[in-house]
Amino acid sequence: YAKIKKDLAQKFPYDIDGYCDGKENFVREMEERALAQYDGTWDKLYIAARKVQHERKLSPLIEVGSVSAAVLSAKGNIYTGVCIDTACSLGMCAERNAIANMITNGESQIIKIVAVMSDGKAGMPCGACREFMMQLDKTSGEIEILRDYETKKVIRLKSLTPEWWSTDKMEMSE
């Protein structure tokens, strides 16, 4: 318990004087319950995406890295990518870049994805990225997308692609 208390004090350095007011057992129970429910996956994905997010100009016609993304594969691996903005339509979103990295490494099933915008906030995948993800696997509708890093608000891909045009084809591929 002392280790949990110390870890929480380091993660949340605010005054927790409830321990001095006879509330320690209640606070201990609440902390243990909260820690048991804590899933650091979104933090790992967000940090992985931020690590590769370095906005830079490759040439007068290509800028990269203003947006980054990280995907968690079904095998538990994390793959990252950055956006590639070109002077014509040959660019690539960070999400599709991360997915291409995953595919290059022999995987094709996504569990979670986060896109990090240039301001550091989580952002939603564009329509092309949503479509690409839906076409990857028959379970793609269950992909969790981080909407807000601070609150860990999540939405499933199927909520963003209602009545998807090729559900029947994906189900027939079984």
Positions of predicted regions on the chain:
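C-terminal binding/interaction regions
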Residues: G40-S59, G106-E174
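Compact, glycine-rich, soluble single-domain proteins
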Residues: V82-R96
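The feature captures the alpha-helical scaffold/lid subdomain characteristic of nucleotidyltransferase
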Residues: A2-D39
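Hydrophobic "anchor" residues
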Residues: N77-I78
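Short beta-strand scaffold segments in enzyme catalytic cores
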Residues: E63-A74
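Short, charged low-complexity linear segments at domain edges
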Residues: C93-K112
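Short coil/turn segments at secondary-structure boundaries
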Residues: I4, L61-V64
